[in-house]
Amino acid sequence: MQEKKSITQRGIIPKDFSNNEGQFANSYANYQLVHKGDFAMNHMDLLTGWVDISKYEGVTSPDYRVFVLNDKNGMCPKYYLYMMQMCYSARIFYGLGQGVSGMGRWRLQADKFLNFYIPIPPYDEQKKIADYITDKVNHIEVEIDKRNKLIKKYQEYKKSLIYEVV
């Protein structure tokens, strides 16, 4: 049996059944295959949904949208990933959605998605943009990690100070 995947704002991750969080299907018979390099998109909730490129082989909900780029030689996957993630973050997809937003279900219909215009610069420019964003994101994550380690040290110091003084 294939491993189940969830699409979160942290990316596509293996479904954790141990913590009883999230939704569980009665049957996984209709789940769709997701291969490494496939795009998977939660288009059912444009406020908390997300899109990512899978790093895993597995299956995901039949309600998610799984797709690949048509022209892998002329299209840089990371460029399109960042473009679509920006459309979530900036609520561009939200403006095209329909449904019950007050109930947390604002969907991007297939026809709106398939006819959505995305700028297509030459491949070299796509790659340059994607590499720039990836480099900056990696740098930011390193800085966040450093800050988190520093915060942890201060928290430990605070505890030891209280212990020593009291």
Language-model region placement:
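Short, surface-exposed loop/turn microsegments at beta-strand edges and helix-strand junctions
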Residues: M1-I7, L33, V51-V66, D71-G74
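Sequence-specific dsDNA recognition surfaces
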Residues: Q2-K36
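A generic structural signal for residues embedded in beta-strands
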Residues: M41-N42
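Short, charged beta-turn/beta-strand-edge "cap" motif at the junction between a beta-strand
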Residues: D45-G49
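A short glycine-rich beta-alpha junction/loop motif
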Residues: G58-R65, V100-K127
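Amphipathic alpha-helical segments
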Residues: Y80, N115-Q155
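Heptad-repeat alpha-helical coiled-coil segments used for dimerization/oligomerization
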Residues: Q155-L161
